[in-house]
Structure formats: C-alpha cells, structure tokens
From Swiss-Prot:
InterPro entries: ARFGAP/RecO, DNA_rep/recomb_RecO_N, NA-bd_OB-fold, RecO, RecO_C. Keywords: DNA damage, DNA recombination, DNA repair. It comes from the Bacteria. It comes from Sodalis glossinidius (strain morsitans). One of its GO terms (cellular component) is bacterial nucleoid. The lineage of its organism: Bacteria, Pseudomonadati, Pseudomonadota, Gammaproteobacteria, Enterobacterales. Belongs to the RecO family. This is DNA repair protein RecO. SUPFAM superfamilies: ArfGap/RecO-like zinc finger, Nucleic acid-binding proteins.
Length: 260
C-alpha cells in the first residue's frame, strides 16, 4: 500500500525493544496489522502519535499479513474521551479488533465508527444508545441481516403489543414464551429504528446485540468489560453518566450489569 489512508489505532502492543505492533482500522482496507519499527524509541517522530482515537493519515508497505509502517501523521488532535466515554471507546475498539476480517473493505463501517467516537467525545449522558447503534451497524456490515419489522413465521408486520422470540438465522416469530430470547413488537420497532426512548427498549437492544455478537466473539471475554467493571468499582458514588449506564445495563440477563 503506497498511498495514504485514513486510519485509527484499534490496539497497540510493544514489539521487540523499540517497536510497536498495531491494529489499524482503515477507511479502505478495514483492519490492517502494521509493524511500526522504532516507534517507541526516544527520538522517534511517531512517539505519541500512534494513539487510539487520534485520526491519522498512514501509509505502509509489504505483502504479508503484517505490513511495515512507512509514515503516519495526525489529521487532528485526538478525540477527547475520558471516564465512561473512554471505556466505551476502548470497548468498540476491542470489538472491531476481535470480529473484523483482516484486510476487508469496511468503508461504510469506518464512518459509523468515526461518528460513534465523535458522539462519545461530545456526550454528557449515558453512552449506551450510541453503543447499541454502533453494534447494530457492525452486525449489519458483518452480513448479519435481521428483519425486525416482520414476523419470520407469517410475514406479517410486528404488533407492538405482541411477543416475539428470536431464533438464530431465522428471525423473530410470534411466541407466548417470556424469556431472554423474547422481545415485544415495540422493542423490535425500536431496534429497527435505532432509537431507544426508554430503559426497556435500551435493555432489549443490549440483549439482542449480546446474543448476535456472541458467535463472533466466541467464549473469550472482552478485556474492556473487565476494565469497565474496575472503573465502576473505583467510583461507588458514580456520576450521572455512570449511574445511567448501570441502570441501562442492569437487566441481569447476561450477568454484565453496568458493562458496555
């Protein structure tokens, strides 16, 4: 890749004494793994540049799975994420690192990611609605198509007052059962619109995205969830934003109250 691409750092880890091994999320090639030689050395021009949430222009070379970074420049200052919003950003970064195929075009998802980060950077309330919308966008880009507005059994439009049960790879069918796989027609409509006007629809969105993402994530837990739990434990008298996140995530259906 000789030209410049817009990119964000999803993950970085030390490599040898002075280098970094990076996962980039790029506008044209999706997730790309890049070796930044000497990036940790004291005199490196890249020192402090290769940070998460900083919009970059980058170029690299190489034909193998791991490319060699040739240059990287910040397009602007890093997006100012802190506290709850920072951990939310780390969560979506880890999601992308875990589920995206290597070097696959996700150009539309790149803008969904950028918009989510921009929302988090300017938000003062709970990040939960933005996270749910991003998860739904991610599932759509992964090819996980679900019709929220029609019963998979009859083809009829969903009724707000009825209950529907989710069946993987089939969709939602009318049901009298009430369990973690059950959703009201009103909740399904909220999922289709990406708008969550109350706690019930927000919790329903979280239940659905947890179920839908599970096959992509496997059994390995997300590190960002553990970091987020530690963050909340350190702040027993949480701010309004943290309290809202706990409330929105507190359905107990998947054992991760207060997580993203």
């Amino acid at each position: 890749m000789d030209g410049w691409q817009r990119a964000f750092v999803l993950h970085a880890r030390p490599y040898s004494e002075t280098s970094l091994l990076l996962d980039f999320f790029t506008e044209q090639q999706g997730r790309v793994r890049v070796l930044a030689k000497g990036a940790r050395s004291r005199r490196s021009a890249l020192k402090g540049v290769l940070q998460p949430f900083t919009p970059l222009l980058a170029r690299w070379s190489g034909r193998g799975e791991v490319k060699t970074l040739r240059s990287a420049e910040p397009v602007s200052l890093g997006l100012p994420l802190s506290g709850l919003m920072l951990y939310s950003g780390l969560y979506i970064n880890e999601l992308l690192s875990r589920v995206l195929d290597h070097e696959t075009d996700y150009s539309k998802l790149f803008y969904d990611y950028l918009h989510c980060l921009q929302w988090l950077a300017g938000a003062t309330g709970s990040p939960e609605p933005a996270l749910r919308r991003f998860e739904l966008a991610l599932l759509s880009h992964l090819g996980y198509g679900v019709d929220f507005l029609h019963c998979a059994g009859s083809g009829e439009p969903v009724d707000d007052a009825m209950t529907y049960r989710y069946r993987e790879e089939k969709g939602f069918t009318a049901s009298v059962l009430l369990d973690r796989y059950s959703f009201s027609g009103r909740e399904l409509r909220a999922l289709a619109e990406g708008e969550f006007p109350d706690i019930d629809t927000l919790r329903a969105a979280k239940r659905f995205t947890r179920m839908a993402l599970k096959p992509y994530l496997g059994g390995k837990p997300l590190k960002s969830h553990e970091l987020f739990r530690q963050f909340l434990d350190r702040r027993p008298q949480a701010s309004a934003g943290v309290a809202a996140a706990r409330k929105a995530g507190g359905d107990g259906s998947d054992g991760d109250e207060g997580e993203q």
